[in-house]
């Protein structure tokens, strides 16, 4: 088994009406927790790392872990560069073996976003690396980047069509009302906008900010063409909450093998639920 491009996973999802979950990773324990569930449920998976993750653990180390787990669990894995902002950073990581990258130029005007994404696409496609880009801008917090409500804006369907045609991007993250992080109230998802984007854009669509979104809303986006669902915050909250509770009950505890396993098990329940919501279970052979 090996580290593969997300395009192979997303093409199957698009053809068969389900979504591939993309779970953000932060350390060896989060990788292991995710893959224990995906292996058990035989679900394809995308392991997504932000620039902050690769500062915490070097790419080469994460890549080695993922390669080893791919063999252990007998399943292909996609290791994805989430919310990266420069061609140089992506180029270095692709040369190290990564085959999936998101270039985030959503903070730029349309023309500048196109120029940046096109440069990344031209390089990545020469390396069998798929490219995701974002049009429109989600609010919330991702790594050290915070986008307030005034700076967020939704994806325009016709701009999305032009963007894909001009860049040759493999998948498109759309802004339809979700945000990074948790919600103070139920998000208002613009399903009609998503349907209009799907009518004019052929590439797989990506839903960012899926943590804390009602399951029925996520299922509806998949019915309307979303084939990759990103989950980050819910995983961290489950893990951290379980570890905090363990220490509250075991104030003298100090063995990481105990409290980390508790956190992992809590995280695994979130992973299990998201796989069921995405309809991705039993999509890879045993």
UniProtKB/Swiss-Prot annotation:
Zn(2+) binds at residues 83, 180, 208. Its EC number is 4.1.2.40. Pathway: Carbohydrate metabolism; D-tagatose 6-phosphate degradation; D-glyceraldehyde 3-phosphate and glycerone phosphate from D-tagatose 6-phosphate: step 2/2. It is an enzyme of class 4 (lyase). Its cofactor is Zn(2+). Binds 1 zinc ion per subunit. Gene3D superfamilies: Aldolase class I. SUPFAM superfamilies: Aldolase (SSF51569). GO terms for molecular function: tagatose-bisphosphate aldolase activity; zinc ion binding. Dihydroxyacetone phosphate binds at residues 181, 209-211, 230-233. It comes from the Bacteria. One of its GO terms (cellular component) is cytosol. It catalyses: D-tagatofuranose 1,6-bisphosphate = D-glyceraldehyde 3-phosphate + dihydroxyacetone phosphate. The active site is at residue 82. Homotetramer. Forms a complex with KbaZ. Belongs to the class II fructose-bisphosphate aldolase family. TagBP aldolase KbaY subfamily. Catalytic subunit of the tagatose-1,6-bisphosphate aldolase KbaYZ, which catalyzes the reversible aldol condensation of dihydroxyacetone phosphate (DHAP or glycerone-phosphate) with glyceraldehyde 3-phosphate (G3P) to produce tagatose 1,6-bisphosphate (TBP). Requires KbaZ subunit for full activity and stability. Is involved in the catabolism of N-acetylgalactosamine and D-galactosamine. This is D-tagatose-1,6-bisphosphate aldolase subunit KbaY. The lineage of its organism: Bacteria, Pseudomonadati, Pseudomonadota, Gammaproteobacteria, Enterobacterales.
